[in-house]
Each structure stands twice: as C-alpha cells, then as structure tokens.
Amino acid sequence: MHKHSLLSAFTWLPASRQRALRRNLIFIVTTLAVGLLSKAFAAGGTYVVDDGAINAPGECNVDAGYTRSPQRSTLSAACTSSALPNLQWGAAIEDDPEQTQLSPQLKGSLWAWQDAGVEIAWAAAAHIAVDRRHPFDGADLGVPLTWQAFETLRLNLNVGWSHAYDDGEQNQRLTWGTGLEYRLADSLTLLAERYGQQHGDQAWQAGPRLHLGKQVDVDLVVGRNLTGDRDRWLTTGATLRF
C-alpha cells in the first residue's frame, strides 16, 4: 500500500530541507495547540517592520516564531488595557545558541486619520541579556506609520534609532523599514518587507500569511541578508489573539 503524507508533496527537496520543514510544521502545530488549549489567541510577530496600529482596548496577542539557519526562537505578548487605551505594553524573549534576550516593550498611538487610512505610533524597547554578567544589551526607539492605500493593500514605513552593544562596543544607528501587506482572500495575505540600519545590516523578508478564522494566523517567511555573508533563512510563526 502506498503511504501518503503532507510531506510527500515535498520529496523533491533535499533531505536537510525536508527535516527543517518537518521541524517547522511540528513547531506550528505545537504552538497552535498550546494556544488553543490555554484559550489564548496570538498576533503575528515574525516580521520586523511594524505597523502604526495598537491593540484595541482590552485586547491582547501572543506571538511565536522559529527560525532555522541561524537557529532562533521568539515568544512575545502584548496587551492594551481599557484604563490606558492609547498605550500597548508587552515583552518578548528571543533565544539563540549565543544568548537569551528579554525585551520589555511599549507602543503608543500618536495620530490617526481614519478617512485617509493613516495611523502613526511610537514604539520603544529595551534589550536585556539574561545569561550575561552585564545584562543591558541596548534599546530601540521608532515611529511606525501605516497607510491603507486600498481595501486590500496596506503600506508600512518605519524610521527609528537603535543603541546596541556589539562585542562590547557601543553603536548608535538610524534604522528604517518598508513593508506591504496585500490581501488576496479572506484566508490569505501576502507580505514583503525590507529593513536595515545606517552603516549596518540590511535584509528582506517575504511570504504568505494564512488566516485560520479571525483569531489565528500562520506565517511562512523566507528572508535574506543583503550585506555581509548574505545568509538565507526560513521562519515559521503563529499568531493568536484574545
């Protein structure tokens, strides 16, 4: 009897790529299962370029992502309270072979022009290395802007500033990013972005986002550095909201 499976459609991939895809699928299924069992529904954080919106008052999201080559996993959560409807607060934890980093985050609404489809916010984050003697690793400030150009198309623009410790050296750089979201159907959105730092790294990412109802999204993202060794990567993520 011939055995069929989801991965049988990807037999043309090299064995190493098949193993990576299998791990990514297991990660997605596990994340969704944990989220559903805990009645938590999270929002997608696999992309770098932010939008100009914040959660509605009383709404929270939890994001999870796994990147292969270089290996990295992330988990984040954010909420907007009814008492402070213009402020979203949260935290992210990122784990890779070199370190584990905790990042408290704040994001606030600056201005919205609903008739023109424009939203502007401010965002701030601090980065703390939890397994290092000197834990403070840097901070980011940014201004994300979103323009709903059409019902199916959103454009995002980010400008900001980053302060980081690179191998003990302090660096301050301007940061930027551009992104677009094109909704093909109720269940599918295509995303692409390019982002970078002044005199630093630059990269792009793109991929589909599957909408499993109104509360669950799944991302499959490919990316590549545009500087240095031009690494490539594959990221899978799950977005759940409540």
Pin down the residues of each PLM region.
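Transmembrane beta-barrel domains of Gram-negative outer membranes and organellar outer membranes
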Residues: 41-242
